[in-house]
């Protein structure tokens, strides 16, 4: 399948800092990714290459944490075929006004019932190691999502706030997962408008690198899995003195 943005969607993204869409992946791909997610979290890496970051493995990790693997595209052909899709890269470039898109990394995320939150953050805040300091993200829901399932949350218009927060504190299971965002909102003298991404599986969202986002506890009885593509503009250059940060 191929995904195309409309001009109205691009304009809405500029206003809100995020865009919720349907039909990013089909049912066959979802079923394949469910299987591959299980194997990745069991340490079964199809290509023989270990992902760059493995934050959770079966039998060795806290079962109540959200499972995360970064850059599974290096380890699994199905993940690679999804996050390296030309149409998704083109959509990111159109939303960012970029000449093209390069992948920064992917995230394989799996949130079982009862899993704890991921703290609110801004993706661009982590990017001192390249310039221009810009990232756009495509988040693909592999299960039906709801507020109760701990789905992704955005703060509407927060990409236009003046403050840019330095990352601090725990990302996985912080004591108050909204704290950094609410502090930023207070500095802006604004009441944050939080939007929960509630969408059938196969849909997803795009968001700006300065948009505040996070996710709460999965209070449902259902798993909440997602595949995430982070992209940077094609003319990005590295900042050598910051590559180890």
Model-derived features: positions:
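Non-heme Fe(II)/2-oxoglutarate
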Residues: 43-55, 60-61, 164-170, 201-206, ...
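Short, structured patches in soluble enzyme cores that scaffold and shape functional sites
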Residues: 107, 122-124, 140-144, 156
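Active-site region of the double-stranded beta-helix
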Residues: 98-99, 113, 128-129, 140-151, ...
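Short, conserved beta-strand element in jelly-roll/cupin
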Residues: 129-147, 198-199, 230-233
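Double-stranded beta-helix
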Residues: 145-212, 236
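A short beta-loop-beta micro-motif enriched in histidine and acidic residues
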Residues: 123-135, 192-193, 199, 222-223
